[in-house]
Amino acid sequence: MLKTQKDKKLENCFSTNNKTKKKKNIIVGLSGGVDSSLSAALLVEKGWNVEGLTLWLMKGQGSCCSEGLVDAAGLCEDLGINHKIIDSREIFEKEVIKKTTESYEKGLTPLPCSMCNKNVKFEEMLNYAINKKDFTHIATGHYARIKKSSYVEKLDCKSFVFKEFLLLRGADENKDQSYFLYSLSQEVLSRLEFPLGEMKKEETRKEALRLGLRTAQKPESQDLCLVEHYGSMQRFIDKHIEPKEGEIMHVNGKVLGTHNGIQHFTVGQRKGLGIAWPKPLYVKSLDRGKNIVYVADKSDLFNKEAIISKVNWVSIVEPKQEIEVEAQIRYRSHPVKGTLIPLKNLDNPTKNFKLIFEENQSSITPGQAAVFYKGDILLGGGLIN
């Protein structure tokens, strides 16, 4: 059974080996789920001085009564560690709710989890740790890994200049969450721990049971926190964006029907179009200015190029010449080979790249992330323009 930090402190009083050993202090982000719970427990077991931190994100969500907050607080009590809730509703509203809404209004398909990771979750955790002064590290339950640059010495990666800390895929390829972390900085990586990075999901559940964690049997959440809060992404959109009628038009120019807002559509969508045609049609593109949803045959959805903007180079120094990468253009897709070319003729030349795929790709979706890998190493990523 897991010993609490309270028990370990008593042990240390009688251990001559620990008299000169200084514990590292770490803040663990706790959602109340099994992954973050196990992360905290494993760090306690390894001898870290742990404090749990839960972000209060949603307006209309009480700080004392949501299931996640209650489970996080209970877990910390079980482990004998401190637990803190900080009110992050304003920054979440500004950086996630507002920006997600604006993206849908522009006809984009945003990635709220990435927005949250970049501007809310890790920022809030790191600032909290820094303000406490004696806390040096932060941790989350993400399935991803961090390595030092020496990791690449035996790899064929001569075309890249690596930074000190590298972000890697999680060992469990089915649970890997590195795609959502492409916006992290070296400062964050230097202080960040992923206790579950080397584990498989089934091992996580077994470990949680072994340690007797109260969240060990808790079902895994499959949805975005926005979906969990609003019930569906459709309800989120309806609450934040006014309907505006427009046309659904075939790419050949024929009007096939009407819609009540481009925010309800995404590139590649087939279901819910409400139109009649001899064979299945898919959303090809969204024209915000004309408020038109363009549809086409599936064969018309394929493209070999995309412009990637707001690129963040996580693990390597920004390349000045074209490089070969493995690009992932949606969370559950497999990475595909491509060439990334810096663009010199756009307003912000250091942040815009042309991505040319080796083979045609279907439904390249504006607003989603294109994340670049070399094997397991996440090089960087940006937004599909």
Curated annotation (Swiss-Prot):
Intrachain S-S bonds: 116-225
CDD domains, per the entry: MnmA_TRMU-like
InterPro entries on file: MnmA-like, MnmA-like_C, MnmA-like_central, MnmA-like_central_sf, Rossmann-like_a/b/a_fold
Amino-acid biosynthesis is among the record's keywords: no
Matches recorded under Gene3D superfamilies: Adenine nucleotide alpha hydrolases-like domains (2.30.30.280), HUPs (3.40.50.620), Translation factors (2.40.30.10)
Keywords attached to this entry: ATP-binding, Cytoplasm, Disulfide bond, Nucleotide-binding, RNA-binding, Transferase, tRNA processing, tRNA-binding
Chain segments carrying region Interaction with tRNA: 175-177, 330-331
Alphabetical GO biological process terms: tRNA wobble position uridine thiolation
Gene Ontology, cellular component aspect: cytoplasm
EC number(s) given by UniProt: 2.8.1.13
Reactions performed catalytically: S-sulfanyl-L-cysteinyl-[protein] + uridine(34) in tRNA + AH2 + ATP = 2-thiouridine(34) in tRNA + L-cysteinyl-[protein] + A + AMP + diphosphate + H(+)
Site (Interaction with tRNA): 142, 368
NCBIfam families: PRK00143.1, trmU
Family (UniProt): Belongs to the MnmA/TRMU family.
Record-given protein name: tRNA-specific 2-thiouridylase MnmA
Organism for this UniProt entry: Prochlorococcus marinus (strain MIT 9215)
